Amino acid sequence: MEQKTEHNVTLHGFNNLTKSLSFNMYDICYTKTKEEREAYIEYIDEQYNAERLTSILKNVSDIIGAHVLNVAKQDYVPQGASVTFLVSEGPVVEVPTESYEESPGPLPENVVLQLDKSHITVHTYPEYHPTEGISTFRADIDVSTCGEISPLKALNYLIRSFDTDLMTIDYKVRGFTRDIHGYKLFIDHDISSIQNYIPEEIKELFHMIDVNVYQDNIFHTKCKRREFDLNNYLFGYTKDRLTPEEQEDITKQLQIEMDEIYYGKNFVN
């Protein structure tokens, strides 16, 4: 079977490239007491339970045009959840032109594409500092597609689905496909930065750093929210209940925590 890409390259057989998107989001909260910590974890567990995560992944599968074969979901005790979608792989029925462009993807109500893919997974990880008042929640979503549609088209929707303070986004293309002359193609679309798939109104909210290895088709972007409002990091009360000294101390703790996650290293021994 022959296929044509947007660049008028006729492929030998199906497009065998595997494109993988890893989206990691973090929510940070200050929980001074054991009761506050337990209440926060309970809230997060309810907010991002397996049922809601399943709904999010269903919309992701619609955006990338995947046909869902099986869904496995689990809420864990004492906390956490995971969902895995097994989706079929197969030939491209129709590929829209915008699938090749470096631009934010659609939201679920705008999706009409029919296409088969491979797998989508999500896992959640609530945790807290053993002695200080920091609690964090991490959600990891992995979208892997085989064919012409890039999972980066789901990124716009994923960012909007979570209330996030920090994000780490990785994208890679693996394998190769051939044209009718046997020439190998290791990537079938132009990409200079993951940021090109994020809408401007979202980019304005975050500091962003790229670390890309173009020759290996590896792209990495990390994001940290620009504005800091202490009220957004307190659970169940506002900063009015705190003294100026307490506000300053908590703000410092939270900002160090976020900087350590953002830069991937410890700043405090």
Swiss-Prot record:
UniProt protein name: S-adenosylmethionine decarboxylase proenzyme
Positions of the record's site feature: Cleavage (non-hydrolytic): K117, S118
Taxon lineage: Bacteria, Bacillati, Bacillota, Bacilli, Bacillales
Keyword S-adenosyl-L-methionine: yes
A molecular-function term among this protein's GO annotations: adenosylmethionine decarboxylase activity
Signal sequence interval, chain numbering: none
Cofactor: pyruvate
NCBIfam families per UniProt: SAM_DCase_Eco (TIGR03331)
Keywords assigned: Autocatalytic cleavage, Decarboxylase, Lyase, Polyamine biosynthesis, Pyruvate, S-adenosyl-L-methionine, Schiff base, Spermidine biosynthesis, Zymogen
Gene Ontology CC, one term: cytosol
One GO BP annotation of this record: spermidine biosynthetic process
Pfam families: AdoMet_dc (PF02675)
Location of Pyruvic acid (Ser) modifications: S118
Highest taxon of the lineage: Bacteria
Family: Belongs to the prokaryotic AdoMetDC family. Type 2 subfamily.
EC number(s) reported in the record: 4.1.1.50
Cofactor binding mode and count: Binds 1 pyruvoyl group covalently per subunit.
Reactions catalysed according to its record: S-adenosyl-L-methionine + H(+) = S-adenosyl 3-(methylsulfanyl)propylamine + CO2
Subunit details: Heterooctamer of four alpha and four beta chains arranged as a tetramer of alpha/beta heterodimers.
Keyword S-adenosyl-L-methionine: yes
Pathway(s) annotated for this protein in UniProt: Amine and polyamine biosynthesis; S-adenosylmethioninamine biosynthesis; S-adenosylmethioninamine from S-adenosyl-L-methionine: step 1/1
